[in-house]
């Protein structure tokens, strides 16, 4: 009977560190719910001590998630562990993940300490974490460059202190697969109490072998793999979880292990992470790239037509990618739209049917037929923009030509006021952004502008993703329409609402902090 490999997702912690703009609490929760649907065993959702915002997002996710274990990161520092526990205590089940560096380089130059002191600190902090939960993970940072004898000493001590999972990370993506496998098997040979903990691996893709390293470690005995969806993360990224999951499934003949992942949710979860994080998936990306199941060679096409297994080691359907696209029209009713969403795997809680159907009718009137990919794009946008809006685009008009200066006029709803403005710009998009900036008086700098087609052909929806800098913080906005100028305007209005909401959250956090101080003074 095969053993289970625990899937530990760190998209919302290690993965988020690679993003140009921080995610809102709502966006993080959206990803967490997608990961829960996919069936991840553990999700690491933040570093609570780092900021009040991160604390709030961890707490919100911990309160909401019911079927996955929620985890938070903490250094081997008392305050880190205490704050992590405070943010997680509302969860059905939670884990505290604490870490300290173990390689000679990190100990000498970063910690300015000794191995004995590191071991002593690790023991104390694992025991402290165990006061809050019986599920404690301990990581030996830079384990890939730690001598095996030193590593074995740390691991044995951490297990004796109460760690239930021991993580052996290749922090800088330096280790080769055969070396990594030797580290794992070496620990099994050297650590007498290793049977009392689950051995985990966390790999980075600096040399392009994060997935290979993780699989080699599993083959050598590791029973937890840490990574992020689509491989997002610092530098070259983390181990791509969807690749590990499908490799274990497809090559079960030699891996002799399994995961409890619902692999039919992989495609949708991957798309959710890509869209919310504003990180497009390369067409040739394994498992989830648009070309992953494409065949252009005549020989390959002929072979696939005769038998798909000639050139496909897995099917698109196995990851939840439905290649049969059905279309709806403006004559399709709400029930038809709801039924199609259910067929694509969406639950009622994933979208607001009233808002989705209104957007569907507007799109159907414009382009006639609405396909599955249109519905998915509309559902995503409506989910992103379902929160109360302070700003709303009421009207816009743009005049532009090859020999004319682009001019835009807008009418923007700002709370209880309606404001109008006009401006010139270097093209229609710049003109409309200049007009919006005049209305709001926000000092916004556009950092990134991206346009992608959602669908096929000349009537495809155009999705605009932008990143702006406002007062030293990055914010992401997204807009969707058949007209790219309209998409661009909607993306900027989405950014304005995100900035406004962030300010409101900051005010609320300050209010709570002040109330806490007032209560202390009263006591």
Curated annotation (Swiss-Prot):
* Localisation: Cytoplasm
Alphabetized GO MF terms: 2-isopropylmalate synthase activity; acetyl-CoA C-acetyltransferase activity; manganese ion binding
- Give the keywords, sorted: Amino-acid biosynthesis, Branched-chain amino acid biosynthesis, Cytoplasm, Leucine biosynthesis, Manganese, Metal-binding, Transferase
The Pyruvate carboxyltransferase domain extends over: 5-267
- Enzyme category, top tier: transferase
Pathway of action:
Amino-acid biosynthesis; L-leucine biosynthesis; L-leucine from 3-methyl-2-oxobutanoate: step 1/4
Name the reaction it catalyses: 3-methyl-2-oxobutanoate + acetyl-CoA + H2O = (2S)-2-isopropylmalate + CoA + H(+)
UniProt keyword annotation of rRNA-binding present: no
Q: Which GO terms describe its cellular component?
A: cytosol
Q: Which InterPro entries match?
A: 2-IPM_HCS-like (IPR050073), 2-isopropylmalate_synth_dimer (IPR013709), AIPM/Hcit_synth_CS (IPR002034), Aldolase_TIM (IPR013785), LeuA/HCS_post-cat (IPR054691), LeuA_allosteric_dom_sf (IPR036230), LeuA_bact_synth (IPR005671), PYR_CT (IPR000891)
Matches recorded under Pfam families = HCS_D2 (PF22617), HMGL-like (PF00682), LeuA_dimer (PF08502)
The positions annotated for binding Mn(2+) are 14, 202, 204, 238
Region annotation (Regulatory domain) ranges: 392-523
Which cofactor is essential here?
Mn(2+)
* Top-rank taxon: Bacteria
What role does this protein play? Catalyzes the condensation of the acetyl group of acetyl-CoA with 3-methyl-2-oxobutanoate (2-ketoisovalerate) to form 3-carboxy-3-hydroxy-4-methylpentanoate (2-isopropylmalate).
**Can you tell me which family this protein belongs to?**
Belongs to the alpha-IPM synthase/homocitrate synthase family. LeuA type 1 subfamily.
Q: What interactions and quaternary structure are annotated?
A: Homodimer.
Name used for this protein in its record: 2-isopropylmalate synthase
Origin species, per record, is Klebsiella pneumoniae subsp. pneumoniae (strain ATCC 700721 / MGH 78578)
Which gene is this protein's source? leuA
């Amino acid at each position: 009977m095969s053993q289970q490999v625990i899937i530990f997702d760190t998209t919302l912690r290690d993965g988020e560190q690679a993003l140009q703009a921080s995610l809102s609490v709502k966006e993080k929760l959206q990803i967490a719910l997608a990961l829960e649907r996919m069936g991840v065993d553990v999700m690491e959702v933040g570093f609570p001590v780092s900021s009040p915002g991160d604390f709030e997002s961890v707490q919100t996710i911990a309160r909401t998630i019911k079927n996955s274990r929620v985890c938070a990161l903490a250094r081997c520092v008392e305050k880190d562990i205490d704050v992590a526990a405070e943010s997680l205590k509302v969860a059905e089940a939670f884990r505290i993940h604490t870490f300290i560096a173990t390689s000679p380089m990190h100990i000498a130059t970063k910690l300015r300490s000794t191995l004995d002191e590191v071991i002593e600190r690790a023991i104390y902090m694992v025991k402290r974490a165990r006061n809050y939960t019986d599920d404690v993970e301990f990581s030996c940072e830079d384990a890939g460059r730690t001598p095996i004898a030193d590593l074995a000493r740390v691991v044995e001590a951490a297990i004796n202190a109460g760690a239930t999972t021991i993580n052996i990370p290749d922090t800088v993506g330096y280790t080769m697969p055969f070396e990594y496998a030797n580290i794992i098997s070496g620990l099994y040979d050297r650590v007498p109490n290793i049977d009392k903990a689950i051995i985990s691996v966390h790999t980075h893709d600096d040399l392009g072998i994060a997935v290979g390293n993780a699989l080699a470690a599993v083959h050598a005995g590791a029973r937890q793999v840490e990574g992020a969806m689509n491989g997002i993360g610092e530098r070259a990224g983390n181990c791509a979880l969807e690749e590990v999951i499908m490799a274990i499934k497809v090559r079960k003949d030699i891996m002799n292990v399994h995961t409890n992942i619902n692999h039919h949710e992989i495609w949708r979860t991957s798309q959710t992470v890509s869209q919310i994080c504003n990180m497009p998936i390369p067409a040739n990306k394994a498992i989830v790239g648009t070309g992953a199941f494409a065949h252009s060679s005549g020989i390959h096409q002929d072979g696939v037509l005769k038998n798909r297994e000639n050139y496909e080691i897995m099917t698109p359907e196995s990851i939840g990618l439905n290649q049969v696209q059905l279309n709806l029209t403006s004559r399709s009713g709400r029930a038809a739209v709801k039924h199609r969403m259910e067929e694509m795997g969406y639950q009622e809680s994933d979208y607001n049917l009233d808002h989705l159907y209104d957007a569907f009718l507007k799109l159907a009137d414009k382009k006639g037929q609405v396909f599955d990919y249109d519905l998915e794009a509309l559902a995503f946008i409506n989910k992103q923009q379902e929160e109360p809006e302070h700003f709303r685009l009421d009207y816009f008009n743009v005049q532009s030509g090859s020999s004319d200066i682009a001019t835009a006029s807008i009418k923007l709803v700002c709370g209880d006021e309606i404001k109008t403005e006009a401006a010139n710009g270097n093209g229609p998009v710049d003109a409309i952004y200049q007009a919006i900036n005049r209305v709001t008086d926000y000092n916004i700098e556009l950092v990134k502008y991206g346009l992608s087609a959602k669908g096929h052909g000349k009537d495809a929806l155009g999705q605009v993703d932008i990143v702006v800098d406002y007062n030293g913080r990055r914010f992401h906005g997204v807009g969707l329409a058949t007209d790219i100028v309209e998409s661009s305007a909607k993306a900027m209005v989405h950014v304005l609402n995100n900035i406004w909401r962030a300010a409101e959250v900051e005010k609320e956090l300050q209010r709570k902090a002040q109330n806490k101080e007032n209560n202390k003074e009263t006591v």
